[in-house]
């Protein structure tokens, strides 16, 4: 026991300190200070002579060893060392899982960062032949940025850093908090002292909550088991003498224990430390449960206060590509920012509506031209000379014997002929001396 080194276990427990809650850090302090230090320092000096000073009032060879085995089937110090190792095992296993998960997440983040590029993808510039003499040089014309890219870029997270490189731990923490976390956690941590010292939210963001609770339950079960075993083996005090009747002792002999009072006090201290660790485990489980319940209540209140969100924007491709005359190569998509895509979609809708109005106006103008009566000014020239012996037309001369209604209709036709058409592409040619107006 004098050469026992606790440095390895202490380093492991200090690493667990970085992935535990506030109550878990208190438990770790109690474990390191009151258990490891007391067992390594106090137990070494108190129990160093427990077998050498255990004497019996007989000279029978082997009787002392048999009686000491009956008095202490397992040494107090060895029992407590075994208890520390077993109780620390769930925490060490949790640490191994946490380190593996975080290392895997950082590796995935590094690969994702390597796939990111500082700008849009540029196609390799083709090697063009030199221009003929007299032509301008094409080397200063720049490179055309493509508008097409593979769809594998769509799975990249929005808001990612532009250049390649690995993010720091603080940036990844803020990133996950802004997205709503990873794993089982849904809470968003605000920057500040409260967010920095709350290990529960960090465990939720890292997706380690279930494993952390499982190791708490196992640790509490081990504490209860060792408390029961310590009571069954040693009771609550170390007696000053022990009556032994085992073979090869010739009769019932009395054996005497060295420093029984000091060992009794130390035994009671270890009982208190074990109960304190068990209480801290229960408090930590209650802290995790109440904290998760509070986060759920706050999330519901925030959702009810915010009210229903805005209606989702329709997809950019609201019209089929075949109807719009668009065709894209397979596995390709337009590289457009989210804001620009929405603005372009609205502009396309406005352009389509304006084009529909123009088409409707053109169709209405064509139908109006088909349904309009012929011009009255062309009657005299288009009909030709009157037939021989036929009656003169009511509108052919000023001295015709037509009725008043016919004269009114002829006047209306003349006004309609002289009025310009709506939507015609060319103007009209007319004369100021009263000649007929001809539309082209």
Swiss-Prot record:
Q: Where is the composition biased (Basic residues)?
A: 112-124
Question: What's the domain of life for this entry?
Answer: Eukaryota
Q: Enumerate the Gene3D superfamilies for this protein.
A: Gap junction channel protein cysteine-rich domain (1.20.1440.80)
What the record says about family reads:
Belongs to the connexin family. Gamma-type subfamily.
GO biological process terms, alphabetically, are:
cell communication by electrical coupling; cell-cell signaling; negative regulation of G1/S transition of mitotic cell cycle; positive regulation of calcium ion transmembrane transport; positive regulation of gene expression; positive regulation of oligodendrocyte progenitor proliferation; response to toxic substance
Q: Which residues carry this modification: Phosphoserine?
A: 372
**Gene designation per UniProt:** Gjc2
Could you tell me where the Low complexity compositional bias lies? 380-401
Cytoplasmic topological domain ranges are 1-21, 100-223, 286-440
Main localization (coarse): membrane
Native species of this protein?
Rattus norvegicus (Rat)
Outline the subunit composition. Answer: A connexon is composed of a hexamer of connexins. Interacts with TJP1.
Offer an example of a GO molecular function term for this protein: gap junction channel activity involved in cell communication by electrical coupling
Name of the protein in question: Gap junction gamma-2 protein
